[in-house]
Every structure is written in C-alpha cells, then in structure tokens.
C-alpha cells in the first residue's frame, strides 16, 4: 500500500506496516508490577481498576443520563407503557451483554499490539506484505481502519456536547426558571474544559477514578431503590421481551433501537484504552462495578416509569429525591466533564498516532507531564474540538437534539473493528476462516443492525458524524497519496548514498569544523537537503550525520532497540532511529543518546539541515488536481519539522526546493 510513511521521514511506502508481528504477550500496565503468573499484585490491580473507572468508563457510564429518555421522550419516542418499557430494558441488557461483555471484553481485548489497543494498533497487527493477505484485501483493511479513525473524531465532537447538556438538564427538573440557563451553562463548562487542556490533566486526573466510583455507586443505589419497590421489572432479563418489542413495532422498533444504542456508546473505549490500564483491571472494573451499576440504574428507571409514565421527559432525574436534585446535578456534571476529558485526551492520542503513521500532517505536540509519555496536548485539535462542540450546543440546544447524531459513528466504528479483527485473527494469529467467520459474523449481525437503526436517524443529525468522517478520510487519503508522490520524486531525483560517497572520496572536498545532521526520509538515498547544501556551498562538515526516523508497527520501541548506527567512511555516519506509533521523536535526544554511547564522535558545533519543500501542483502526478491543491495546502500549514522534532531553532538551516507533482 503506497504512501504509508511518516510525515517527517521514514521508510518507503511499500515497507510500511509490512512486517509480520506474531501474537504474543507483552509488557502492559497490568503486568509491570506482577505477582504470580503475571497477575498484578492486589493493590496494584485495584489501583488500576479505579483509574480505569475514571478514564475508560466515563462515556458509557454517563449514558443513563439520556438513553431511556431518548427512547420514550425523543424525536422517535414510543409510549411508556409496560410492554414497551420491558422491551427497551431487555434490549439494553442484551446489547450491553453481547457488545461490551462478550465482543469487547472477551474477544477484542485479546487483539493487543504489545499491550496497546485501538483502531491503529489493530491495523498494525495486519500483515501488509507477503502472501498472507492479498493486495485488494490490504487496501480494504487500510481504508476501513482510516474510516474507523475518522469516525472516532465525529464521535469525539458529539460526546462532550451531549454529556454536558444531559447532565445540567437536571436543573429543569428542579425549577422551570433554569430552562434558559442550560445552553449558556453548557457552553461555559465546555469553554472552561478546553481552555485548561494546555495545563495538562495529571493532577486533576487523580480524582477522576474516585469521582466515577461515587457516580457508579450513586446511580446503582438510586436504581436499586426503585427496583425494590417494583421488582416485576426484573422480568425484562428475558430476551423474549426484546423479541415481542420488534414483533409489535416492526420498522419503528428499529428506529427505537437506534436510541437503545446510546447505552453502549463508549464501549469501544474499553479496547482503545487497554494500553493505559491493561486488560485485567479493565475487566475487573467492568464486571465488579460498571456493568451491575448500569443495569441497576437502567432497570430502576424502568421501574420508575412503570409507576409514573409521566417521568419520561427525564427518567434519570426522576429517580432522585427532590432534596438531592442539585447535588445530583453537580455530580452528573462532574461525571460528564470526566467523560468529555477522556474523549478529548483520546483525540489527542489518536492524532499523534495518525501523524506518526503518516496519515495526517505534522501538528504541534506538547508534553504536559514530565513523568507520563501519554500526557499530551495538541492545540490545533483542541481549538477545532472547542469550536465544534460549542457550535453543536448552540445549534441543537438539547441533548435530545444531539441524540440523533450520536450512535452513527460509534456503530460504524464497531462494524469496522469487527472486519479488521477478522483479518488479524485469520492472517496474523492463524485462526481458521471456518472457525473465525461465524464468530465475526455474529458480531457483524449486531453491529450492522445497530448501524442500520442509526441510519434511519440520518436527517435528525446522523449526517453530522458521517460528514465529519468523510472530510477526515479525504484529508488522510490525500496526505498519504501526496507523500507517496513526493517519495517517488525523491527516488527519481536523488542519487544513491553510495554514489555520493564515491564522489566525495574522489574529490578533495573542503571540510569545515563541526557536525551537520541531515534528516533523510530513507537511509539508502542521498537526502535532497545534503545535495542542495553541497551544490551551493561546495563544502562539507567534519562530521556528517544522516538521520532517518523509522516509525514501526508497534506502539513503543524499547530503548535498547531505538538507535542503529553505521559508519560510512569519509566522516559520514548513518543513524536510524526507530519509534513506535505512540511515541514522538526528539532529534536532540537521539543525538545525545548516540554521543553518550560513543556511537558517533561529538564534534561541535552541531547544525541541523532540513529541506523546505515548495509544492507546485501542476506536475505529472496521477492525483486529481483538487487533491493536489489540498495536499499543497496541508503541507504549507503543517507544523514545521524544527518544532516537531524538537530542534533548537538557532541551529537549524532550511534549504528550499521546488517540487512539481
């Protein structure tokens, strides 16, 4: 698959994500501090499980705020009669069981890439060369994964808006006077949330787990109290009620299923955040706390509706005693902020992975914690999300309006994940197609049914995440193909490094004191920046370093495998530095490591040479003209290599070059 190389340099397109990765257990947070048989010590496991409550389960944990409400009081609501209430509860129970407990907890979390999860980690497990997978299948898998990643951005725009709105809508239950305050309050909370991102969340993040623990305990208690008063609601455990619901409502039942899907939004976060906490703590927190708390609250809302159908306008807050309404609104608002924070941090992480894998241009990546590699802030993404999230609140003005847009992205991503999982299981792990197809087919039956039910709400807001995904896929595909075209140009116009070194050895080239570091997109060709430097200045430095950054198909690269150095003669050294797709390369740190290990001589001063490309979209490239112009625009506005690679600006020399493509 062409074009799969990092924006700042890397391997040729044909070799990217190409090596076969055997499925094996790697270090992950759950076994860093281990007891017997690799199981974490009890204290460590409980600490990770508590942390997972705050990061992994914020989204799905706040779904009770709006799921039942949307079924019985939304745009396509049904009457809150006993048969419908029991049918909806049965659908919620079995959706959580089949999709979250079985698909994600039991199967998807086995597909870890050295402990990491998520769509890009899953894609990186698929072999991209050889006879294990056909060329057409590779193209389908890559495009599916890119679409899945793009859909996550659409989901990321909606989650903060709908969770914050639904939380503070409890004020309407307390007093009618609060109705006009909902939108301004939601906008103010979102504005504050995005403005504090640049300061990092390491300190405040420590309270996320305890707050969500209180949240789950509270919603479970509220639900249990109602169930005790009306235990008949427990009969909805039987799937017969779900069957009767569809038998009675037919197509309208599918529309309501699109609202039931809101109960599983956030389920994909279990897999995506696996690298932060490990599969054992995530499973523990799900089965010990989250799953039972959600079921108790949903069934409690159902029990309350059986007693008072007029609570349908906001059944969640209908469970709360009036004297506790304001404290509950405050707790729900904190839970919604935590859910939003998890989504924002996930968008930052996803963007960094996409940059490293060469799917989007370089962006500004700020590390907000000296201790934690994953604590990052990306101002470009933060500004975009802030504008879109506040815009959604101003346009839709209520959680019920946004509910139509929510779910489409999640269910489409779930279906895509199932497809990629099939290729990982059959091509990487060696599972037989005959055994894998029925399992994945079962997943897809649920995924496609949920996705289809949400498409029925296309004109009620479902178009929004799909439009966002389409734009992002176009950007990623154009950037990938554009970088591939530039690589072809470099291959055609640059001599091999061996040829250049032969010329240097034959001529008495004047050398100046110091070290010159040239960034090279491939280790076999002469960097264009070196060619232009030598062409115009007619000199070389005493020591010349050719530095290539390789991004691997693994999340991280061990320090011992980071740097490979080769002495080329004539004062030239080649350094190949390998990074995982969840890491950010820092060139001065690479050089310091090489100096400390005495792999290259340290000759001062050090200058860094970069190529500054001016793209002219009028060349022979096969890309469509509008895609060429888009690629040129993205290239002009991408983060500079100086900032992205952490280079000291006073030591950087940029050499311009025009490229027609």
UniProtKB/Swiss-Prot annotation:
Name of this protein: Probable potassium transport system protein Kup 1
Transmembrane segments: 48-68, 85-105, 139-159, 177-197, 207-227, 251-271, 286-306, 324-344, 384-404, 405-425, 436-456, 458-478
Signal peptide per UniProt: none
Family: Belongs to the HAK/KUP transporter (TC 2.A.72) family.
GO terms, molecular function: potassium ion transmembrane transporter activity; symporter activity
PANTHER family, alphabetized: LOW AFFINITY POTASSIUM TRANSPORT SYSTEM PROTEIN KUP, OSMOTIC STRESS POTASSIUM TRANSPORTER
GO cellular component, one term: plasma membrane
Catalytic reactions of this protein: K(+)(in) + H(+)(in) = K(+)(out) + H(+)(out)
Keyword Membrane: yes
Function of the molecule: Transport of potassium into the cell. Likely operates as a K(+):H(+) symporter.
Keyword Membrane carried by entry: yes
Places the protein is found: Cell inner membrane
Region feature Disordered, mapped onto this chain: 1-38
Compositional bias of kind Gly residues: 1-11
Membrane topology according to the record: Multi-pass membrane protein
Highest rank taxon of the organism: Bacteria
Record's keyword terms, sorted: Cell inner membrane, Cell membrane, Ion transport, Membrane, Potassium, Potassium transport, Symport, Transmembrane, Transmembrane helix, Transport
């Amino acid at each position: 698959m062409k074009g799969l190389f990092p924006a700042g340099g890397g391997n040729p397109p044909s070799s990217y994500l190409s090596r076969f990765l055997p499925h094996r257990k790697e270090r992950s947070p759950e076994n860093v501090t281990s007891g017997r048989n690799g199981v974490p010590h009890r204290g460590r496991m409980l600490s990770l499980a508590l942390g997972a409550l705050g990061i992994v389960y914020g989204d799905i944990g706040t779904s009770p705020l709006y799921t039942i409400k949307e079924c019985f009081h939304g745009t396509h609501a049904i009457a809150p009669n006993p048969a419908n209430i029991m049918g909806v509860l049965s659908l919620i129970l079995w959706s959580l069981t089949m999709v979250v407990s079985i698909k994600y907890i039991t199967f998807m979390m086995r597909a870890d890439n050295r402990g990491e999860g998520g769509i890009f980690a899953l894609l990186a497990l698929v072999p991209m060369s050889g006879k294990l997978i056909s060329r057409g299948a590779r193209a389908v898998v890559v495009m599916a994964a890119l679409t899945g990643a793009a859909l996550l951005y659409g989901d990321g725009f909606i989650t903060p808006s709908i969770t914050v709105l639904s939380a503070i809508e409890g004020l309407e239950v307390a007093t009618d006077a609060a109705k006009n305050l909902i939108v301004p309050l939601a906008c103010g909370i979102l504005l504050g949330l995005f403005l504090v991102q640049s300061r990092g969340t390491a300190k405040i993040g420590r309270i996320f787990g305890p707050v969500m623990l209180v949240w789950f305990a509270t919603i479970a208690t509220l639900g249990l109290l109602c169930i005790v008063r009306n235990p008949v609601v427990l009969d909805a455990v039987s799937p017969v009620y779900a069957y009767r619901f569809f038998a009675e409502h037919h197509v309208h039942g599918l529309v309501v299923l699109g609202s039931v899907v809101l109960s599983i939004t956030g389920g994909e976060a279990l897999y995506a955040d696996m690298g932060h906490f490990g599969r054992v703590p995530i499973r523990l927190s799900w089965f010990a706390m989250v799953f039972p708390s959600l079921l108790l609250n949903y069934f409690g809302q159902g029990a309350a509706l059986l007693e008072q159908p007029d609570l349908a306008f906001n059944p969640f807050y209908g469970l709360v005693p009036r004297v506790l309404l304001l404290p509950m609104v405050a707790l729900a608002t904190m839970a919604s902020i935590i859910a939003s924070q998890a989504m924002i941090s996930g968008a930052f992480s996803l963007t960094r992975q996409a940059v490293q894998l060469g799917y989007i241009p370089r962006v500004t990546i700020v590390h907000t914690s000296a201790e934690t590699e994953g604590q990052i802030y990306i101002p470009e993404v933060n500004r975009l999300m802030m504008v879109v999230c506040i815009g959604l609140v101003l346009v839709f003005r209520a959680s019920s309006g946004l509910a139509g847009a929510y779910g489409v992205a999640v269910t489409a991503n779930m279906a895509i994940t199932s497809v990629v999982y099939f290729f990982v299981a059959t091509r990487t792990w060696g599972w037989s197609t005959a055994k894998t197809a029925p399992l994945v087919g079962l997943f897809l039956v649920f995924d496609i049914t949920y996705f289809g039910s949400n498409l029925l709400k296309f004109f009620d807001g479902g178009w929004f995440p799909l439009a966002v995904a389409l734009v992002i896929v176009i950007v990623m595909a154009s950037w990938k193909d554009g970088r591939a075209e530039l690589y072809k140009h470099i291959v055609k116009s640059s001599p091999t490094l061996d040829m250049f070194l032969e010329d240097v050895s034959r001529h008495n080239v004047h050398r100046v004191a110091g070290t010159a570091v040239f960034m090279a997109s491939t280790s076999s060709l002469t960097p264009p920046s070196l060619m232009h430097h030598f062409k115009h200045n007619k000199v070389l430095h005493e020591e010349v370093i050719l530095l290539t950054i390789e991004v691997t198909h693994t999340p991280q690269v061990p320090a011992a495998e980071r740097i490979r150095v080769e002495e080329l003669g004539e004062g030239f050294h080649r350094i190949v530095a390998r990074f995982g797709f969840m890491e950010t390369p820092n060139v001065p740190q690479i050089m310091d490591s090489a100096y400390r290990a005495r792999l290259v001589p340290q000759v001062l001063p050090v200058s860094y040479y970069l190529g500054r490309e001016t793209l002219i979209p009028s060349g022979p490239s096969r890309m469509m003209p509008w895609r060429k112009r888009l690629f040129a625009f993205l290239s002009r506005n991408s983060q500079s290599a100086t900032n992205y690679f952490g280079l000291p600006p006073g030591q950087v020399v940029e050499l311009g070059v025009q490229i027609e493509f």
